[in-house]
Amino acid sequence: MLTLTSACIAHHTTILTECTTSASSQTSSLASLILPKIQHSTPQKLTYTHGTNHIHYIAESPSEHPEHPSAGGLTFLVIAESSLGRRIPFGFLFEIRKRFFEAFPEGSEFADMPNYGAASFNQDLRGLMVDYGTTAGGQNDAISTAKREIDDVRGIMTRNIEGLLERGERLDLLVDKTDRLGGSAREFRVRSRDLKRRMWWKNVKLMGLLAVVVILIIFTIVMATK
């Protein structure tokens, strides 16, 4: 099972390249809600928690790219199952950051790129997600990369996504969960109706049997008094 469910590289809110391995639409909606909240005034390495998902990202800053400030608006983001921890997702992020800058040098005009303007990188994203998310070798490479890049992933700030989003945005995130609950509720209602129908027929049969017994008793009494 893939434990890296969605990844993207964006310039501010413009998604340049993206890959989703999860059938759920919730993962991509998480990314679209997080990106507008990310500040690039200083470099950031941060994890947000949302249920069983963790949203990890590395946000560039113009201070890291003084000669190419456009690169300072980039965000490298991945959504992973919480069971994967943080070393593997951040190792993955450091690797895609390195490969992305190899394919698109810092001097590229990222601000002028349209949505999915770096879609040629999609295959690289998917390949790394599969490798780092499912293979022991890939996960070991990710951990080694994370150790090289950061001394201690526990130093990465972790926040709950609920504190980041406005109420309306939090409601948007419930849509996917509500759809699943709605399906379960419909199934429950169908089963409830079937159960009620069976109980009704059972009661009808019982009442019919009681009526027959009462009639037989009355008939017996009448015959005995003659």
Regions found by a protein language model. Give the residues of each.
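Extended N-terminal soluble domains of membrane/secretory-pathway proteins
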Residues: 1-138
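SNARE-motif-like long amphipathic alpha-helical rods in endomembrane trafficking proteins
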Residues: 120, 124-226
